[in-house]
From Swiss-Prot:
Family designation: Belongs to the HAM1 NTPase family.
GO biological processes: nucleotide metabolic process; purine nucleoside triphosphate catabolic process
Species in which this protein is naturally found: Salmonella typhi
Annotated protein name in UniProt: dITP/XTP pyrophosphatase
Subunit (UniProt): Homodimer.
InterPro entries reported in the protein's UniProt record: dITP/XTP_pyrophosphatase, ITPase-like_fam, RdgB/HAM1
Gene encoding the protein: rdgB
General function of this protein: Pyrophosphatase that catalyzes the hydrolysis of nucleoside triphosphates to their monophosphate derivatives, with a high preference for the non-canonical purine nucleotides XTP (xanthosine triphosphate), dITP (deoxyinosine triphosphate) and ITP. Seems to function as a house-cleaning enzyme that removes non-canonical purine nucleotides from the nucleotide pool, thus preventing their incorporation into DNA/RNA and avoiding chromosomal lesions.
Amino acid sequence: MQKVVLATGNAGKVRELASLLSDFGLDVVAQTKLGVDSAEETGLTFIENAILKARHAAKMTGLPAIADDSGLAVDVLGGAPGIYSARYSGENATDQQNLEKLLHTLRDVPDDKRQARFHCVLVYLRHAEDPTPIVCHGSWPGVITRQAAGNGGFGYDPIFFVPSEGKTAAELTREEKSAISHRGQALKLLLDALRNG
C-alpha cells in the first residue's frame, strides 16, 4: 500500500478518509503521527490554504499528501467567516463561541437574507513539487437559523438549515450528511479523480 500523509491532526477526518482510500491502495496517516506541525495558513482562499497544507506535509514527509480546507460563507457578510470560520471569534475560539458570534452578527438580518454555503476543498499532491495537484471543491447551500438545533456534527452545523432535508446539519445522521455535504461532494470528486487517473 502507498502511504499518504493527511495534513491534519483531526482523528475523525483521518478515519473517514482512511477507510475510503484504502480501496485505492492508499494507507492514510495523520501528519501529527509523523511529527509534522500544521502549516501556516497564509492563503486568501480555501484552495490556496489546502495547497499550502498539502505541500507542507509532502515536503516534510517525502510522501504524497491530502489536505482539506473548509468553512462557511454567508452571502450577506460577503462570504465571511470564510477561511476564518474556525477562528471567527478569535484565534483559540471554540465552536460555540464562533456560532454565537455569527448569530449575534446576523441578529438584525431578515430570514430571507440568511443564505450561506459550506465549502470544502480537498487537494491531493503526488509529491511536494507536484505542478498539477488534484483540486476538488464541494459546496453545500443552506440558511443560517436564529437558534441552534441538533446535537450531531460540529462547528456551525446546529445553525445551518438544509432546506432539502427540512432540518439543520446537526440534526442529520452521519450517513445523511456525508451523502450531501460539501466534504462528501469534494471527497466523491477526489475518489473519482484517483479512480480515473
